[in-house]
Amino acid sequence: MIQGVILPIMANAMPSPAQAASPAAVSLNETAASYPPLRTGLRGQYPGSFEVAHAARDGLFAGPVTATDTGEHYDLVVVGAGISGLSAALFYQRAMGPDARILIVDNHDDFGGHAKRNALQYKGQTYLGYGGTMSIETPFPYSFTATALLLDLGIRPDTYSSYLKTSRLKGLEPAVFYDRENFGKDQLVPGYHEKNWDSFFRDSPLDDETRTDLLRLHTQAINYLPDLTPDARQALLRTISYETFLQRYAHMSDGAIRFFAGKAFRNNMRVDTCPAYDAMKADAPGFNGMEVTHDTPHESAVFHFPDGNATIARLLVGRLVPSFFGTPQTAASVVMAQGNYSRLDQPGAVRIRLNSMVVRVEHTGDPTKPNDNKPVRVVYQKPDGTSDTRHAVMADNVIMACFNNIIPFIVPSLPEAQKDALKYPSKVPMQYSSVLLRNGQALRRCGTQSIYAPCSYHTRLLVDEPVDIGGYTTNPSPDRPTMIHLLRNANAPGHPRKEQNRLGRQEMLAMTFPEIEAKTRDQLQRMFGPLGFNHEQDIVGLTVNRWPHGYAYTYDTLGDAYMPAALRPHVVGRQPYGRIAIANADSTAAAFTNTAIDAAERAVQECLISRGYT
């Protein structure tokens, strides 16, 4: 439980596991009005946060944009308070000194970008969840820059095992939920793992052909491309989808392929959009007998905080605006620390201005002249479109740490080729719902810690990893409130991947919170109702984190033409423009926290070069 106190631990020092697990006895004493993580209902890119952004996209700010000058002049303005933007501000401050004046502007009511903190209250206690970015985890090692930043913030991923209490999940295993619309009956079947394939598929509501096909795929090592050399097999697998491989070469029935309908590969590639080669690298079934080699990823260390990577964002804000927490925080103490949002935009070296949508960034001088020292004008207004009042500040540098797609409409003077490149990616829509259950009895009765639901509204259910850190305890117990996470990545099967992202985004924006809540309650009732679950009594909190513009777009061998690295859209799009630089995950074509941090460091270096400092 979260007690909302700041523990007296020295900065930059992680406590021992024994210290981290020590209990506390007070409750979070904030309200949703003053503490955004407590706001429930529809969050993420919620109504009121994006209307002006859509107006900019639709050309409302195509001409000159008038605004009242606030008289403020900053060394740096950062557009976007996600991890990349916050990291850029800290890197810039280190380079220019503690007196550098920095303003961070964001259109949401909370900082962190996709790394949002969810806090749900029940009976005087508060329970944490993550609203987007889940963990420190990548299929490749963190760079020196990203690793050094984590260490400076007091985060040591190699210590995670000290806080992880896997014994609390003993007896719980993955399960699959089959829905009656697609499989004939609602049934939750545990035992979804390789040690149990025979009994698992025997207990599943599948016809004989589907069951036989899935058993063959999961248990037999068959070379489905016997007439090709290993190199030719690899080449072919790069050019076909996993669905095509299953249909054409593994001869799976339609029922067997339906089993994979909700399977999400990296960055939400689905069975019909994921290259078969990538599915093989992700250990999808069907490739054990193919004798095709592939690179083994050198994965980074893993660390999961109860609020996901919102902890990183909170530690960054604590460094930039020390009064936010009042005292220095460690990676452990910050888990329960209360931040004072009223202090974010007070006079000081760094200010964070939330609920403000930037609609224009423009040079007042000539961006093509290296020695032009005229400032950049930044205009912003309320993001919901209820007021036409706009304000302008001046900055010696600007870092665009928002989505690539919106930048051409905010910085219309960019070269046309660069604007086209920035418009190229189609961000992946995602929806993370944090659901607080009155207790964990239903999960224990069915013996599951995660559920795959191939054709349901939410395709994944996860019980959070059990950790003890900073006095906060995650324990999926039958006798205490339990946080679960539901994942949905809206898509439109049968279309190219980018089009699926666009159609999924439209669907998400069209749905209201009551509609999402009804689908959530219906699905959980159908999953757990036979185990005594009653959604009206047992669901005691719900926060839906809707991200129509979610994960950064990544290239694949089906939907993107090969081209030299220097010509790829994300590289062309991120080029500095006078005193303006770009830092975000989009600029790395990778949906990872560490690449967002790397982009921040690059953008700061480009800013310093633009001012003749390096």
At which residue positions do the language-model features occur?
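N-terminal export signals
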Residues: 1-23
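Conserved flavin/dinucleotide-binding core of flavoenzymes
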Residues: 24-65, 119, 436, 442-614
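Glycine-rich active-site loop/strand segments that organize a redox cofactor
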Residues: 28-42, 112-144, 224, 231, ...
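N-terminal Rossmann-like FAD-binding beta1-loop-alpha1 element of flavoenzymes
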Residues: 75-103
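Glycine-rich FAD pyrophosphate-binding loop
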Residues: 93-119
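Dinucleotide-binding Rossmann-like beta1-alpha1 core, especially the glycine-rich loop
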Residues: 123-213
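Active-site/ligand-binding neighborhood in enzyme catalytic cores
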Residues: 219-357, 364-370
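Mid-domain catalytic core of redox enzymes
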Residues: 346, 350-485, 489
